[in-house]
Structure formats: structure tokens, C-alpha cells
Amino acid sequence: MKLGIVESAYMRYGISEGAKKAKEHGFECYDFGRFIDTETEFFKLPEEEFKAELTRIRELVQAEGITVWQAHAPWRFPPRDATPEDRAERLLDMRKAVRGASYLGAKHFIIHALMPFGSHSPDNPELMRDINAEFMAELAKEAVAYGVEHINVENLPFPGLPLNYTEQCLEFVKRMNKETSSDIFKVCIDTGHSNACGESPADAVRMLGKEYLGALHVHDNDGTRDTHWLPGEGTIDWEDFSNALAEIGFEGCMSFETEVPNSVPLGVERDRREIELAEIGKKIIKRI
């Protein structure tokens, strides 16, 4: 099992210097989050410039021993997925992000379900699932074409949605693999989302098993809010989570979707806190 973290935790130092520091602290992989906001100058770059910049990032971080393991899909809130036109526009951005993941060398693409009826419980849950199935099937074609191995459907912190809990995501992923005659779809467990919705992240891991657990977003909270705290600051049972990963033989990346707070200035104290976070990660994946 590998140890990863969001790239924003170390990009503040510069691409090469940040990757070097991440590696020195004990991390091996990045979770790339710069595709989330599609309104940035970066995301709006023409395709060739977009590809060149991401290829440059990949080469620089790889030179320091860091692999971009996974990339997060575009995400906007409040959601704007209500009309076919909204979803067509979103699909264009998603396809570009999948290509971006490919340019980075990332094999895992992590996506939230579309919310065509908002983040509350829809009147027609089956229609929501069908809309997502049609959308995801189209996105899978781009992933296959560009060598991105898995689209990971992430559990969410919106209890009313029919694609929120781990079990719901699992059933959807099984449906998508059947409909696409593939095994491209897996589930990303977000530990904070699970905890905020009353699910045990460890039990979610056991439910999916090695076959369906593709990626992880690891962080903590108080069981009610999606606060992205560091592990140990909230109520998640990390020993049970660690044991669950070992039980199923997970071989992917245990990736933190959290980082040392921005309030901690650069220097000795921040280095100490970042190393501590890596040590927590090593304990979870049972390296120490």
C-alpha cells in the first residue's frame, strides 16, 4: 500500500521542491485537485498548453520520486446538472479532466455523482441514477481512450441522495461495469463523508472488499460536518480502519484529503507537523 496526499499540501513550495519535501517526509503519491475548479486560467488553457503543463508537472514530481496516483474530477456546489445542456457542458469539462489525469500519469479518476435535482432527496431516485449512468458511460469512453484505468465513484455527505452511501455507490458501480462490459468503475471511500453520514469507514472498506475499493480520501471530522480534519482530531476509529484495509488486502494508495492548516507558517514547525501527518499515515497502512 502506498501513502499519498493532496498535491496542494506541497505545491506551495514549488513543484520540484514540494515533491522533494513530500518524499522526504514519507509520501509517495499525489492526489491532484486542480481540475475541481473549471473556471481557472489553468483549466481553460488550450489543449496543447494544458497537456504540456501537466506533462511538465508529471516529469518534475516523478524526478523527485512522487507519482500522481489519482485526480479529482470537476466539482461545483451548488450543483448545476439539471438540464441536458448543463450536463453536456459538464461532460466536456469531465472529458478534459480525464485527459488531464492521463497526461499526469494518474490511473484513478475520482468523481462525485451528478445532482440533477440538487443535493436533497429527489422525487425520482431512479431517474437520478439513470442520468448518472448515461453520463458515466460516456465518460468511460474517454477514460479507456486515454488509458485512465478506473473511474471511482465517491460516497457523498448528502444523506438524501440515492448515490450517497457506500452501499448505493457499490450497487451503481456494479451496474456500470455490467452495462459497459468492463471493470473500469470502482468506489472511492471518503472517510469524512462516511463518518458525517453515520457510516463506519472501516465497515465501508469491508463492504467493498479488494475488488471494488479503488481509491481513498482520508480525513477526520466530528461525525456531523465535513471538516477535513487531520486523522485523530475527530471521531473516526482509525485502528479499525487500518485493520479493515489490511483484512481486504488493499494494494492502492491511502491518500490524505487533508493537510497541515495554512495557519502554520513555512519553516521548522510546518515541517514537523507534515512529518507527523506522514507518520500517522504510516501507522494506518501498518508500516510502523
Regions found by a protein language model. Give the residues of each.
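Secondary-structure boundary elements
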Residues: Y103, K141-H150, K178-E179
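Structural motif corresponding to the early beta-alpha repeats
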Residues: E28-E134, V260-P261
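A generic structural signal for short
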Residues: V6-E7, K44-P46, E85-D86, L127-M128, ...
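Hydrophobic, aromatic-enriched interface-forming segments
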Residues: V148-N164
